[in-house]
């Protein structure tokens, strides 16, 4: 087999990865000299860990072809050596599909062992994963494929009872209408699919340099999805050196080693479950990843008891569901030493129940796919653990807390969080406008979070400045919903709001003002939900409450303030 040259542009006319904003060389040099950035790629890190732990357990989980039926506890077990074999088979599958090193591959897999096989396989092969969620639908996937020029789309037919083949056909047809080449579909759950012979290590191609970095470790390794505050999720280019620094330090802070067993109940593709310290942190430490087919307490508790899992990352609604269930059932969670809670603010009253009910230490986590990650530490005062979201990973994480005019706020006062550092990006992929608004000229990322800093340095999240709904840790851009309503419905105005909810944090609400002389029918909610599904919107974004009004209320000075209006209507919908 001929290997790809470092200047390969990919198969079937696939374009090379476009340039994206990089950290200035002087700053990058400091990060190297400080030991934050090391000259190691994902391929090198994974092969090193495989060689060091070849006979140790790497992953426990269901297979994709067992998803339509069977028990949620039916599992396979792979050692690190077996994971390598499966990953090399996945790499062979990518090669047979026409993928070449440097090409982008959309990975849209549930929590099955195939997720790890194809993630590791893509990294070993030199393809760049684009981590989509199983919940994403045709509208979002069309955008991901078009913006990345993805060469392949890896799915598990039947996952979450969804027809991913039909989904692919739907958006592929739309791409072809635009003169674009759709990604090749790879269905890992197809029992008739040809099982390729795994590649040998010596057949792995040479890595491709993307964006001209002199060090391969400072090239992009994959594209993660942002939570999104405007439209479809933005693409986040993560480099080997920066991301692996975050993974290594997270694993150290969280005390991972070769005996660690992490239960992954949330979607594996989430940045939280991927790297904080997540799946990659466990693989770095030589531990085992326990994949739960669903996040229910029943499934999770059974796996914790059977596999002796000792760490579990959760979002607040899931943590609260575990607490409520544990109070009723008294499961054996004696192996669990650490429960991480992140993705949204965790109410102190709920946080206080983690240790007495689940029997594990609580660690609050506050981070973002763009970079900055904060953890409470093992030796933190209990009150800080219950009420704050921790301190940054790195001594070189820079944090600014500013008022609306861009001035530093007095210590202890809430303000807008801006940050830059050794693992925070300097810009999105292919998003010139968003880069101008989301990043300052000197490279600080405007997170959209409102925080206050305690004298100890701990950050406490008090709210959001950006227009975004946080539903069970899934971030939903209100502009996407409002634009869709204006485009597809007979309305003159639309406002999407987050409705406070104890179970999921916020539910999706939509307020509509019909055009003059137009009506939305007897059941506007049903009409909206059907229309949004037809547009290919992910189910978690579909409005759960719809209100029709003759006009939108004005502020006391006669103007429409979108920020005040959303707060006013959210309060009304919550009644």
Where do the model's predicted regions map?
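Conserved beta-loop-beta connector loops within the AMP-binding
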Residues: 385, 400-418, 455-456, 518-525, ...
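Conserved AMP-binding/adenylate-forming core of the ANL superfamily
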Residues: 36-38, 55-112, 116-120, 137-142, ...
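Conserved ATP/PPi-binding loop(s) of AMP-dependent carboxylate-activating enzymes
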Residues: 392-396, 407-438, 476
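Structural core segment of the AMP-binding/adenylate-forming
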Residues: 2-12, 120, 127-199, 516
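AMP-binding/adenylate-forming catalytic core of the ANL superfamily
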Residues: 136-143, 153-155, 312, 421, ...
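Conserved AMP-binding A3 loop
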Residues: 77-81, 221-248
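Gly/Ser/Thr-rich phosphate-binding loop
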Residues: 309-313, 325-384, 398
